[in-house]
Amino acid sequence: MALSRVCWARAALWGSAVPPGLYVVRRLQFVRSGLTWGAPRSSKLHLSPKADVKSLISYVVTKTKVINGKYHRFLGRHFPRFYVPYTIFMKGLQMLWADGKKARRIKTNMWKHNIKFHQLPYREMEHLRQFRRDVTKCLFLGILSIPPFANYLVFLLMYLFPRQLLIRHFWTPKQQIDFLDIYHALRKQSHPEILCYLEKVVPLISDAGLQWHMTELCTKMQRGTHPAVHDILALRECFANHPLGMDQLRALQMKALCRAMLLTPYLPSVLLRHRLKTHTTVIHQLDKALAKLGVGQLTAQEVKSACYLRGLNSTHIAEERCRTWLGEWLQISCSLKETELSLLLHNVVLLSINYVGSRR
């Protein structure tokens, strides 16, 4: 009764006569709806700002991949001749970017743990060595692209001269074989000159036994015989001091050796000697790391790349023969001291010139 009187009193003040029962029902409905509207939303139904950003990024990436796939199919269908170099170029950029990230991780790890280059595992050492050469070649293209509108000329030069201007990532499979054959033919041109210098220094060797060994080795090379490991190691003293030590090499000898190592010979004698020392030291360090790892742990491509770096044209030689040759090289290299690295430098010619299958 009291509640009904209050309701009638309020209705009278508001100027309308509303039955008390109806007012109570409406009031309860308003309270329930207010409770429903005012309740906090569940976190399960709505993502946080970070999750929203991640979902947006994943959506954009997915859409980009779809559009990119459609674009590739369009190019392959309507412009097949352009699609092949375009695909190789894009894959080359991806591989170069991946190499850069890996090299950065290796350098960061070296800096954190105070590791020197020669203390790295073989694969990391080889990756850094190759990446430095690739970056040097890419920097040359970058310098050419600096002038206004020069980038169009650079693209034309890259298309016309891929062997000279591009790194291996941007070569087709056929180009990789052809270009490696061309490079090996260029370094083979220096082999007769290097052997001729070895014959000329025979009278300058003071030890009669070493003179005989050098003469025998040169005779075997001229007859087309592949020398044994002990035949080469028997001459290590000749390459430690006069007349074939690294510091006793003449300018013409160093230029011929640079061509055999695929290094530019168009530098002053001081720079040629420094570059030969540096390059040979890096190969010697790689050999020590590879001996620890073991030739059997390398893949077929790694074996062929290692042989090619050391003077053997491995593109046309069976994998097992490449492994055998690389084992002979490591046997010689790991037996040498730092003062005898001139022998390792000449070994690029001595061990590869008459190997079975390398005469191409």
Swiss-Prot record:
It is a single-pass membrane protein. Residues 186-360 form the Letm1 RBD domain. PROSITE patterns: LETM1_RBD (PS51758). Pfam families: LETM1_RBD. Residues 159-360 are mitochondrial intermembrane. Its main location: mitochondrion. Residues 1-110 are annotated as: Required and sufficient for mitochondrial import. It is found in: Mitochondrion outer membrane; Nucleus; Mitochondrion inner membrane. GO terms for molecular function: ribosome binding. It comes from the Eukaryota. The keyword Isomerase does not apply. Keywords: Membrane, Mitochondrion, Mitochondrion inner membrane, Mitochondrion outer membrane, Nucleus, Transmembrane, Transmembrane helix. The chain crosses the membrane at residues 138-158. Residues 1-137 are cytoplasmic. InterPro entries: LETM1-like_RBD, LETM1/MDM38-like. Plays an essential role for mitochondrial structure and function, as well as thermogenesis of brown adipocytes. In brown adipose tissue also localizes in the nucleus where it interacts with the chromatin remodeler SMARCA4 to regulate thermogenic genes expression, such as UCP1. May regulate phagocytosis and inflammatory responses to lipopolysaccharide in macrophages. Involved in tumorigenesis and may function as a negative regulator of the p53/TP53. This is LETM1 domain-containing protein 1. The gene is LETMD1.
